């Protein structure tokens, strides 16, 4: 458990890797999470290698002023508790490097110039408007140089 919100894209990557490496030892897991940029609670559960998670309309959304937290429970055998805890903590939403209006290069198969339109949009660190004829919008799933870079 930790206070604050997480980056759901980091969680998805971590869970995929965890299940690939240790899925046979994980019997069940479940949790309720605060995802940065979303008002709904993210509820998930899994059995062995089967993972299911979604933003829930059945559970009340985070109320204004409510302390946001992330809770995760694993049941299994021979689990590395410290590695599980660290992996979960590594999914915490990071402080972002860019602000609305900043010019960046966004990776859309190749790095292309764009402008940050919104921070923490639909659970993604950035929504970027690509500076081309279409002015298409893309989400940046993780704030690192693999996905988005400074123009400077």
Locations of regions flagged by a protein language model:
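Basic/aromatic-rich interaction segments and small domains that mediate binding to polyanionic partners
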Residues: 100-151
């Amino acid at each position: 458990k930790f206070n604050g919100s997480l980056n759901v894209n980091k969680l998805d990557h971590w869970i995929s890797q965890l299940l690939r490496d240790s899925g046979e030892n994980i019997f069940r897991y479940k949790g309720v999470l605060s995802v940065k940029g979303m008002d709904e609670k993210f509820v998930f559960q899994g059995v062995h290698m089967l993972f299911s998670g979604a933003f829930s309309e059945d559970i009340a959304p985070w109320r204004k002023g409510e302390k946001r937290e992330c809770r995760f429970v694993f049941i299994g055998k021979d689990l590395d508790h410290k590695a599980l805890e660290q992996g979960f903590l590594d999914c915490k939403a990071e402080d972002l490097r860019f602000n609305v209006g900043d010019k960046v290069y966004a990776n859309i198969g190749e790095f292309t110039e764009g402008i940050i339109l919104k921070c923490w949009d639909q659970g993604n660190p950035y929504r970027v408007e690509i500076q081309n004829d279409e002015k298409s919008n893309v989400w940046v799933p993780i704030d690192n140089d693999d996905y988005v870079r400074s123009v400077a």
